[in-house]
UniProtKB/Swiss-Prot annotation:
Compositional bias ranges of the Basic and acidic residues kind: 593-607, 649-660
UniProt superkingdom: Eukaryota
Assigned protein family: Belongs to the SMG8 family.
Regions of compositional bias (Polar residues) in chain numbering: 608-629
GO BP term, example: regulation of protein kinase activity
Functional note: Involved in nonsense-mediated decay (NMD) of mRNAs containing premature stop codons. Is recruited by release factors to stalled ribosomes together with smg1 and smg9 (forming the SMG1C protein kinase complex) and, in the SMG1C complex, is required to mediate the recruitment of smg1 to the ribosome:SURF complex and to suppress smg1 kinase activity until the ribosome:SURF complex locates the exon junction complex (EJC). Acts as a regulator of kinase activity.
The encoding gene: smg8
Protein name per its UniProtKB record: Nonsense-mediated mRNA decay factor SMG8
Basic residues composition-biased segments: 219-228
Keyword presence, Ligase: no
Amino acid sequence: MVVCGGPTVLRDLLGADTEPTWKDEEVCVVGLFGKTALAQGSWHKCSLINSLCDRHIFPLFHRAPERPSERSLFQTYYEQESRVLYVLLAGLSDTGSLLKACEELSRGVSHAEAHEWWKDEEKLYCMHLLYLFSVCHILVLVHPTCCFDITYEKLFRALDSLRQKMLPSLKPSLKDCAVGLDWKLNARPCPPRLLFIFQLNGALKVEPKSQGPQTNEKPKKHSPKRRLQHALEDQIYRIFRKSRVLTNQSINCLFTVPANQAFVYIVADEDEDPVNMLLEGLRHNCTLKDTESLVPISGPRRYQMMRHTRQLSFTVENNTSLSGQLVDCTLREFLFQHVELVLTKKGFDDSVGRNPQPSHFELPTYQKWVSVALKLYEIIIENKDDDPPAFPGGFPPKLLANMKVLEGYLDADTKFSENRCQKALPMAHSAYQSNLPHNYTTTVHKNQLAQALRVYSQHARGPAFHKYAMVLNEDCYKFWSSGHQLCEERSLTDQHCVHKFHLLPKSGEKIEPERNPPILFHNSRARSTGSCNCGKKQAPREDPFDIKSANYDFYQILEEKCCGKLDHITFPIFQPSTPDPAPAKNEASPAAHDGEVEGEKMKDKEPQTQGESTSLSLALSLGQSTDSLGTFPEGPKAGGDNTEASGHGTDEKVEKRPSLVDRQASTVEYLPGMVHLNSPKGLLPKFSSWALVKLGPAKSYNFHTGLDHLGFIPGTSYLMPWDIVIRTKPEDESDLDTNSWPAPNKSIPGKRNSVVMGRGRRRDDIARAFVGFEYEDSRGRRFMCSGPDKIMKAIGNGPKESAIKALNTDMPLYMLSPSQGRGLKPHYAQLMRLFVVVPDAPVQIILAPQVQPGPPPCPVFVPEKQEITLPSDGLWVLRFPFSYASERGPCYSPKENQQLPSYKVMKGILRTVTQ
């Protein structure tokens, strides 16, 4: 038997530069595909070719050549004597490829991703099968069991649909090939004939003929194996006819099966003892060795000895027959009865019915077949005429479209999962939309989406779970964003805008509620009552959404009606030098917060008395409010050399330090928020959030009647007295000499002191000032506090408490209002004004407010001018900001579970310096 080399990869065969000597021989192409058993070294498709060619072509433990770009691989072998070209397809159904795929999928891949990857590989395997069905005359399906795998029915229907879709693109590629017109029109030499080879795997015992008791039963005409073959043929034919894979006209079918020839063959292994098999092989080897010169051996000696040793049923079957029983044919005889029809150019006449149509058939030469096979390989397998993929590692567009055809046939799991998930989507949508307001926020959307996903996960199953979970997410977001999205802006009192998603009107633009999206101002529908800068007039106010409307615009409107004619001390603001000034970027160093907290701890450790100087805080603010290139001192040392002035009448002066406003302010960039101790140097806001107004002279305040302002709770509108000691020199101290006699009508000081107690000591004058911390709630209720969390209750002639305690402690910025509402939510009042009556006396009262509206690292806010000397003989009122905000955002009022002491006005807000 003349053979051609060993197995070759099909792509190498088609692209070979040298032409073989048999290029003009007419060849029959036989394709083999199918599944193999999982056991290593078990029955394999390669062993069939070894048996058919009677030659050891493929090794026992054959491994296909590894090509990273190809999971499925074609291998070929040409038997020149019989003029048969075998094309073997190895894919994921083989043990080696399956093991490698499982190793790749075990590297942390999710179930859905693994399923998708596996189905993509199955579709690519179908493309290789389509190629095999397009270039072969005969196809052999190999299966490791004796039961027909029903999944092949879906596979063949998918291949048929895929072939019909790709046929228009295959025809043009063959127009230049030297083959017949029918081949060019149908893109195949003939409708291939499909044969089936099964393995028993112990399902049917094949007893040796010498064994078994002798019986008088009449032997059956067919052996059990042949009867099983006939049963499988009937079953396969019925299945394919019912599913219309096979029809009357073979020219329209993907493949054909013969009507009057066997197309199923069963390979049966004898049940052998391994020890007996080895002993029998040894005997045969010895016998062959003794008679080596007498018996001619064709082919490799080793393979011939293996064949004689094992006597596999698909190699050489015993031709002896029982009486009356037909002899089973060998595997080669089974296959070559169909090959002979090809080589003799008779073709396959497998059409049935009343009017059968003849099918085309062509037997090409080896060279013509290679030219056609190369063209089809480039189109079907390599996709050379396709566009590049949309992304690296993806599939080309045409290949994706072809693979889409296969989804409905092959991916039953995904189809079931998609149907199941699609049924779960309406239930999830209902769960999302249940109990929803017309407009709602992101938080409500996320909560409802989580509830919808819980309902969805109870009903959805399979690999499409994540896909439709994303669809549910998109549907819910689309429902929310199409007219149900509430404006996400929160007011400075931490309340959401009630409008649906809208745009803010630009400068000079009108409000358009009917526009989509509408153009509206923010509105939370919350209203409160506030007082003007001086506190005399009250008016309702809208819930503010920005600092300017909260701390400036509202008071400017009331300023025109009430406080406009009063004296003011204005705070410095940003003065632009360009038409389009820009807000300054946040350049505050994170370390500034640490320095601020450390400085506050230093302040708390040092006891402060009445009127103690706040120069230490000022020094800290100067040292810590630096730009991004600045450095921070290790400790607060700026106030060490400063001589503090006592509130009891010391003559010492306070050394002035330059404040932020004394430096050159920027005229290009403005501060977007409010001034605090960590603000960059030289930056000022465009407006001031503070106000300092003079209500009148000091005598305009009546200690017995208090303030005559609206909204005060009875008995709480009084200011606390603050006695300031002014130290003076004794009378005639310069003229008095203790060593001389006293002047006429004068007594000796020492004796006078000993005689009249207190009449000869230094005379101390006391100036009386008045201080009041006013709190105001959202309903306009106002009251004074005489200390932390202590509401003033004055009866009769005014309060008896002194202001010294309140000035030397941190006053709360928020406290519970004495008039609580009916709800369970606590109602807070906020420190809004500081009233100071400055007497007409030789004393200076310096105002230095510092407010920390939250726990650290909340900044400490100060006015644009940190220290203000209040002129004498006046009733002054400092209006605090309604809301506080830095360049990082607003500082909201405390919640129910937050500690109120963290929101405070620092002690040392007032101090005195005698003149």
